[in-house]
Amino acid sequence: MRFDRSLFLETLKQGLSVQGLTVSADSLELMVQYAEAIAVTNESLNLTRLVEPAEMAIKNFLDSLTILRSDVLAELPEELHCLDLGTGAGFPGVPLAIVKPNWRWVLLDSTRKRLNFIAETAEELGLTNVSTLHARAEDAGQEPEHREAYHLVVSRAVAELPVLLELCAPLVAVGGIVAAYKGSEAAEELARSEKAQRELNLGLEKVACLDLPQQMGSRSLLLFKKTGPLAERYPRRAGIVQKRPLI
């Protein structure tokens, strides 16, 4: 297929300008290349339903980068160890790794084929700050190498908030940030997650709402700070988290 690089690039640049985000020309080119790789590979491997250039630029890349507007991240170290839980086709982790080369990323997913694509493409693009982890979040959260090991844990379109927080909390360090990318349903999910926040030692720091350009929807970014060590019983076993959420 022919990917319209110019349309993708111009749409992304306009969106970044509206959001007050500055990205280098080198980073923009890497994002164009990553988007093109997705569009081409998606013909044989189901990576994402978003392959139209303008839609991909806004709903995947720009949406991923909106966390950079948050002052909450200013409290974290300059060189971050980050995890993207349920990365799918690499969002938000890959765009953030491109724009922030001093942030080291682990992209976690349970689908090996997607991770293979991400790893191969990241190597082709020279993204030395990206690695992948094939695992369930419930299992990774109990492994010493990953438990409370990350300054920043992000997740987009993975699960309802009470479930998502239990998956993320074991992975983020005390004082670190969990960032949940949500849509217009964020207020309802926040109300249902009060017990989860208490149980998991997560305090809501900020809710950032925005409308995407070209009427492509509303987004909410929910930022939580880890206020204390997590009880050993969390996360619960795979399946239990979803069947009996902390609500």
Language-model features and meaning:
Residues 38, 96, 182, 224:
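Residue-level signal for inorganic ion chemistry
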Residues 138, 160, 183-187, 212:
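Short "lid" loop at the C-terminus of a central beta-strand within the Rossmann-like core
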